[in-house]
Amino acid sequence: MTFALFQWGLVWGGMFTGPYNLTPFPSIHDRLALFQGLRALLPVAAAYIALLWALAARARFRFGLTTPGLLTYYGALGLASSIVLSPDTPTAIYWSSAFLAPLLAAWFVIERPEPLPVLRAFLRVNNAIIVFLMLAVLPEAARFGFGQATRFEVYRMPFGLGEVRANGVGRYALVVLIVAFVSLVASPSKKRLLWLPLTVPALFILMQTQSRSALLGLAVASMLFVLVRGVSLRFLIAGPVAAYAIWLSGFTWRAKGELGSLVFLTGRETTWAKGLAKIGESPVLGWGFHADRILLDSEHMHNSYLHAAIQAGIPGALLFAAAVAVLWAFLWRSGVLRRVRRAAPPDQELLIQSVLLLGFLSARSFFESTAAFYGVDLLLFVPAVCYIYQWALENPAAEP
């Protein structure tokens, strides 16, 4: 397990940096710049180590047509496009390698004799990192306070980690709320009470950011919780709080009481039109990873499926869409959604957290580029998916 966790640390190590911090190569006298630049190499190192292991062990690729498998095929196609068609080949190859790193790390774990405990550890590491990220922006959030304009704020991260916009910060807050609420409800340990103090700053930040994708995720996660766990006294208390947060932050502050403002795309349609034009110029292979930033004057696609298409063409977009569709078909057909409430600790808690998290990220994929490139969303998505698949494999549904 130790080496697998080390490898997962390498995958996370490249977050909030990139090859731009290596050009020009930082001076050895500027330790922070050197640290940021060298961190950019860590996900690529993780992918390289996993490939060396696969070749040495002659490992069989067991993901097949599962969600991790389809995402890997999408990443491989994007890597080929990066090599052949990208206007900035080195940058595109870097980001495609970084995208494949968590999938290759998960493959390494799945091939171990007992993968489930390692995947549990990955989920707990992810939870700890998201809590850290939320607390890291809390001083900025406290400085901004409440107001209708807070959704335009940019939150500065400590330690030279850069800046995060309100949508990204809202995502941190919602993930903390999901993990905290499920732990308080499903965990038998008294340590679950440690999550209670975190719910207050998480709810404060979620409402402050007025992030529509995060508020939508809160609604989706709430419905999924009722589906997998049923209505309980705790939910009857938390449900109205969630509804009030959505109404106040989303409808009253963000939309100013007008439903039309709530569904306004804030310029996304212009970016989508530019992206579609570029996709039309290379519909089969796309333009390689990071294509939106390279070809659209550093604009972001804000849609996972268009993001996949501009990077890996229409086939890549279909692979990505299939990965999401196959996931939810598997959750339903395998009975995981029905069997979660009967799972033994600690799996019940982690399964519910994973299902709710995947519901949020799936809903977010229509308005943000969730899991279509190397980023926080991808590193949350991959372990949650692999954990659910592995648990279902080790705990098959009883024959009717």
Where are these regions (language model features)?
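Alpha-helical transmembrane segments of multi-pass inner-membrane proteins
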Residues: 120-150, 164-228, 329-333
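A membrane-periplasm/extracellular boundary helix in multi-pass inner-membrane enzymes
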Residues: 135-143, 226-265, 273-281
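Long extracytoplasmic/lumenal interhelical loops at the membrane interface
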Residues: 25, 253-315, 331-342
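Hydrophobic transmembrane alpha-helices and their immediate junctions
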Residues: 59, 65, 191, 314-362, ...
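Transmembrane alpha-helices of multi-pass inner-membrane enzymes
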Residues: 236, 355-364, 369-400
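Aromatic-anchored transmembrane helix interface
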Residues: 67-79, 87-111, 121-134
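Hydrophobic, aromatic-rich transmembrane alpha-helices
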Residues: 1, 8, 43-60, 175-186, ...
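N-terminal signal-anchor transmembrane segment
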Residues: 1-57, 77-85, 136, 361-364, ...
